[in-house]
Amino acid sequence: MSESGPQTGAITHTEPETQFDELDVDTPLVGIIMGSKSDMPEMEKAGEILAEKGIHFEVRVMSAHREPDTVADYCRNARMRGLRVIIAGAGLSAALPGVAAAHSDLPVIGVPLSSRLSAMGGLDAILSIVQMPPGVPVACVGLDNARNAGHLAARILSG
């Protein structure tokens, strides 16, 4: 194997549009998004963990089903705005984490959320997040466990 350059199948790295060192100290590094305002009580827990660790974050409510263009625009522009990780919480069919991953090269952490409307007790949300097609990775924490999403985001940022 030649050491003169990338080989077939080699992974190459390109610099992001915004350099980490150039970011304002108050620039959010983590975007916390959720499909509905009713998801806020659980998803706020990710923010609490990030705040404890001194990590700036932003919170948005946007539905992959009702506002697909909003989700796509948010995720496409996330890196340019300084985000480094996206935490996406959703219940039922839980499309939001996968849609976020499809529109961003940032790490996406999916938080499956239980719902009184679910006939499967949240298993539907878990399976929707973990069963992604090749090339669209989403990390998944436990059901209703946004705290672990906050911890995982912090670990990703520390690496």
Residue map of PLM features:
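Short glycine/serine/threonine-rich phosphate/pyrophosphate-binding segments
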Residues: 39-44, 67-71, 92-99, 119-120, ...
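N-terminal beta-loop-helix "entrance" segment that forms/cooperates
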Residues: 59-81
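SAM-dependent methyltransferases
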Residues: 1-29
